[in-house]
């Protein structure tokens, strides 16, 4: 009993035992179980071969080897961009190599005083350059009436020029400015109106209407109409979808105005022919071509082209129109200078002395005949009128 008590006293004095910590790794666990000798004591045949294989496995399973293998064999999304970048670098080096061998501009041209003057002159021309205007004075020897103009014939690969050297671009600009469009809208419409297809439409439409009204020629009219339709399709396809509706609401009216202005500019002496009926027929035709519908009657009343009777599209004043007396005098002068009054020749070949007359002169001849008939007896008037139409 005494021995037990002494042991209890010793144990109480020693205090509680410290608990052993659990193993934290596989090596500690093996050591704790007294298995630390395994598998080091296991011996395989051909130890060198196994160690080499193990080394290869370790190398092949490393991060670097896996990344390299994937980089070389797996297709990448940005591979095309990388190839392009490398090619651009290569080409930039080639370009730098070539540019380094080119002479500098200053070493090729000596900076003399004459060169400086030439440079200043070039800058002056760029600053003050304007498009050349062709303005026809009334003294120029060009035909100013319908009778003196003729269509030279349709050419498949070439537009027929407008009469009296008129410029289609100038005519379109004149029409656009008359509409007083906003500056931004004007710039947009200007690019479309001055396009190649729109210029072709004005040329061919003018000549088609000229032939239709004054010189009927079915073959040339058909050729012109075919090209008009092709040009219209080209223009239609060239207009962006966002502007198409707005543009083709104004285009037929502007084209009709441009054709009307061209007739006024080309034939100022025949301006009396370009009356309200002329404008109505012209507009109806152009609108039917472009939209398939006729415009409202009297649509031309909003046209701001009244000044064309006295002023050209360039702003210069026109010569005053000839009076009826002046037209009669011109007609009589033409008759006296072109008709041979040798009665024997006339009787032998009467058809050779029949002259083609204009609508203007035919109207004047009717006017003079009616005036003479009212002053003479019926028999004399009848003979006189028959004589006038015989000679004319």
Curated annotation (Swiss-Prot):
Q: List compositional bias (Basic residues) regions by residue number.
A: 7-16
Q: Per its UniProt entry, which superkingdom is the organism in? A: Eukaryota
Give the region (Disordered) as residue ranges.
Answer: 1-23
What's this protein's family per the entry? Belongs to the FAM227 family.
Q: What is this protein called?
A: Protein FAM227B
């Amino acid at each position: 009993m005494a021995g037990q008590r002494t042991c209890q006293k010793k144990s109480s004095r020693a205090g509680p035992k410290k608990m052993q910590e659990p193993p934290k790794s596989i090596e500690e666990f093996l050591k704790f179980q007294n298995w630390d000798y395994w598998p080091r004591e296991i011996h395989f045949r051909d130890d060198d071969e196994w160690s080499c294989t193990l080394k290869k496995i370790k190398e092949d399973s490393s991060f670097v080897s896996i990344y390299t293998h994937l980089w070389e064999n797996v297709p990448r999304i940005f591979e095309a961009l990388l190839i392009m970048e490398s090619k651009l670098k290569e080409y930039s080096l080639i370009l730098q190599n070539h540019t380094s061998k080119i002479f500098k501009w200053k070493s090729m041209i000596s900076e003399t005083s004459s060169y400086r003057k030439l440079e200043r002159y070039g800058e002056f021309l760029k600053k003050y350059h304007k498009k050349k205007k062709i303005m026809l004075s009334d003294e120029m020897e060009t035909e100013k009436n319908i009778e003196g103009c003729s269509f030279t014939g349709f050419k498949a690969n070439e537009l027929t020029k407008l009469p009296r050297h008129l410029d289609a671009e100038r005519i379109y600009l004149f029409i656009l400015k008359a509409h007083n469009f906003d500056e931004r809208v004007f710039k947009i419409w200007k690019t479309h109106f001055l396009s190649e297809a729109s210029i072709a439409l004005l040329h061919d439409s003018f000549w088609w209407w000229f032939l239709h009204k004054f010189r009927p020629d079915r073959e040339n009219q058909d050729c012109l109409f075919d090209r008009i339709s092709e040009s219209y399709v080209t223009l239609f396809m060239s207009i962006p979808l966002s502007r198409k509706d707005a543009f083709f609401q104004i285009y037929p009216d502007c084209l009709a105005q441009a054709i009307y202005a061209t007739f006024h500019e080309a034939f100022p002496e025949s301006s009396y022919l370009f009356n309200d009926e002329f404008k109505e027929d012209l507009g109806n035709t152009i609108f039917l071509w472009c939209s398939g519908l006729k415009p409202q009657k009297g649509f031309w009343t909003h046209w701001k082209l009244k000044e064309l009777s006295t002023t050209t599209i360039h702003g210069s004043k026109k010569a005053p129109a000839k009076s009826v007396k002046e037209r009669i005098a011109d007609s009589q002068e033409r008759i006296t200078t072109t008709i041979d009054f040798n009665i024997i020749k006339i009787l032998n070949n009467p058809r050779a002395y029949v002259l083609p007359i204009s609508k203007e002169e035919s109207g004047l001849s009717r006017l003079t005949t009616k005036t003479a008939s009212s002053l003479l007896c019926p028999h004399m008037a009848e003979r006189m009128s028959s004589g006038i139409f015989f000679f004319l």
